[in-house]
A protein has these predicted regions:
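Structured catalytic-domain cores with a bias toward divalent-metal coordination
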Residues: 1-162
């Protein structure tokens, strides 16, 4: 065959029963297809996104999660404490990721697929809040500070026309 289709199924956090069940149902339905349809799915049946950037928090930025009043001024960036709820949801421009608590922070480090810094394309500081500049879908957004420091904060996806 000239083609070998492959997919990645994102189903939530490891070990969550709903994610495991969702993956199982998807694979079962694929395995029981009598044939691969020759027509594309209906537009209403498919949301197509692609990863456009990796978001990192610079090493010099002291960050935490929750209300800045609890930090005693020790943080540069106070991220919203339930940001992981935005995972795999398309969010509008202007969505706050947290409060900027020092002048050291003007945006996240955001790198596109070519390794170019595109932070100013996706984020801005407005009224003391670090906000999205455009409609995006965060993926793999984590609240684990060790993962954020060792790997990344999240990825950003944008809708592909279909």
């Amino acid at each position: 065959s000239k083609l070998c289709p492959a997919v990645t199924v994102e189903c939530g956090r490891p070990g969550e029963p709903h994610g495991v069940e969702h993956a199982r149902e998807f694979l079962e339905s694929c395995l029981h297809l009598s044939e691969i349809p020759s027509h594309p799915p209906a537009h209403s049946d498919l949301d197509l996104f692609h990863t456009v950037a990796t978001v990192k928090i610079p090493d010099y930025v002291r960050f935490g999660f929750g209300d800045s009043s609890y930090s005693g001024g020790s943080l540069d960036l106070c991220l919203v404490d339930d940001l992981d709820q935005l995972n795999f949801q398309e969010i509008p421009a202007g969505t706050s990721f947290g409060e900027v608590c020092s002048e050291m922070v003007d945006h996240f480090e955001v790198w596109n697929e070519m390794g170019e810094d595109v932070g100013d394309h996706f984020f801005l500081v407005e009224d003391g809040q670090l906000r999205t500049k455009k409609r995006v879908m965060p993926s793999m957004l984590t609240l684990d500070e060790e993962v954020i420091r060792q790997d990344c904060f999240c990825y950003l996806m944008e809708r592909l026309p279909y």
